[in-house]
């Protein structure tokens, strides 16, 4: 009899332990705006990954290109200059050194489309979540979303004071500083300020000029004003500015071609047959610099059976770059300088 009581007691303890474990590990409901309306992740009929702010911090995601560390099937590729880079989802995407080539992975920040690649490379502001939609999304997001969408949602200004400063250092004299502050202005208005700097020395050497290349030198500022009225009206005004000024980019050969033999015949140095080389032989330092700015007004009005949303924005981008397009120490081709507004 005592034996059966002992077994019954153990069974009850085991059942209660399972219930307590289940209650303490409830799955948090994930909200996404992948279909332009707020729905739970289970209700969205598309393939989407949602990355929270905590996941971004833990993975040390600095900019949109780092998202490939936490999102399956998302890839990024760097081309000849800082701004000539591209996103690929499930292997699909457009990448080129041609400024006229439109991307097939659309990137939105708070509902505002970033059309130029150079406006996508700056560090992320204070983020609430990032949504990555896989597959064609042109019905809701336009013609440049045939491969997918990266949708970045930033934190709204808070009516409670909050400030945060974070710094990180790394090899090649890498220094990253991020600052964020938010506070109320009145019972119906709040603001936030966000500033980022990202600097690092180059990890490759130009043997002709003696200077480093592939360095990092970027700055960004963002100001946000939130107005909430008693009649379910929300107005959010955002202004942002960022700039970059870098020597980029290092190149390497996978195998020797006839053009390389021509460079050797002219007494020039060319990139070795090593895609991971830390040396380049440009007869001048290839550089890439630019700045981006924008302002947007987001109006949301809650009605009885619907929500009215209006997003109005204006963006401006300027860039200047010069590339040694023969990739060797000779002057076979003149410097290719591009100024894009």
Language-model features: where?
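Short, solvent-exposed loop/turn and secondary-structure capping segments
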Residues: 42-44, 143, 204, 248-250, ...
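A mature extracytoplasmic/lumenal domain signature
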Residues: 36, 52, 80, 91-93, ...
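Cleavable N-terminal targeting peptides that direct proteins into the secretory/outer-membrane pathway or into
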Residues: 1-24
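Short polar catalytic/cofactor-binding loops
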Residues: 33-38, 169-172, 225, 241
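Outer-membrane beta-barrel translocator/receptor signature
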Residues: 85, 102-104, 116, 126-128, ...
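Outer-membrane beta-barrel domain signature, strongest for Gram-negative TonB-dependent receptors
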Residues: 210, 216-341
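Acidic, small-polar-rich N-terminal luminal/periplasmic segments of exported/outer-membrane proteins
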Residues: 26-160
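Short, basic, glycine/proline-bearing loop/turn elements
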Residues: 105, 163, 331-335
């Amino acid at each position: 009899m005592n034996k059966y009581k002992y077994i019954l007691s153990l069974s009850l303890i085991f059942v209660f332990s399972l219930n307590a474990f289940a209650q303490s590990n409830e799955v948090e409901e994930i909200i996404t705006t992948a279909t332009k309306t707020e729905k739970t992740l289970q209700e969205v009929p598309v393939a989407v990954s949602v990355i929270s702010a905590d996941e971004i911090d833990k993975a040390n995601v600095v900019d949109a290109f780092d998202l490939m560390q936490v999102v399956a099937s998302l890839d990024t590729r760097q081309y000849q200059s800082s701004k000539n880079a591209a996103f690929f989802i499930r292997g699909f995407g457009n990448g080129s050194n041609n400024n006229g080539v439109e991307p097939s992975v659309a990137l939105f920040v708070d509902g505002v489309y970033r059309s130029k690649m150079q406006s996508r490379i700056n560090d992320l502001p204070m983020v609430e979540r990032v949504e990555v939609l896989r597959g064609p999304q042109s019905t809701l997001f336009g013609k440049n979303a045939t491969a997918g969408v990266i949708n970045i949602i930033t934190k709204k200004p808070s009516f409670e004071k909050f400030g945060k400063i974070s710094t990180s250092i790394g090899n090649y004299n890498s220094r990253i500083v991020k600052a964020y502050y938010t506070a109320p202005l009145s019972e119906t208005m709040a603001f936030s300020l966000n500033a980022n700097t990202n600097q690092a020395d180059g990890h490759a050497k130009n043997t002709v000029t003696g200077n480093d290349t592939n360095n990092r030198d970027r700055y960004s500022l963002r100001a946000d004003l939130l107005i909430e009225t008693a009649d379910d009206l929300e107005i959010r005004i955002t202004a942002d500015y960022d700039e970059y000024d870098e020597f980029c980019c290092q190149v390497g050969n996978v195998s020797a071609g006839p053009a390389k033999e021509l460079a050797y015949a002219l007494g020039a140095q060319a990139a070795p047959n090593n895609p991971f080389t830390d040396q380049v032989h440009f007869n001048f330092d290839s550089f890439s610099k630019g700045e981006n700015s924008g302002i947007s007004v987001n109006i949301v009005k809650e009605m009885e059976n619907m929500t009215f949303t209006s997003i109005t924005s204006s963006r401006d981008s300027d860039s200047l770059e010069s590339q040694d397009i023969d990739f060797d120490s000779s002057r076979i081709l003149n410097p290719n300088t591009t100024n894009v507004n």
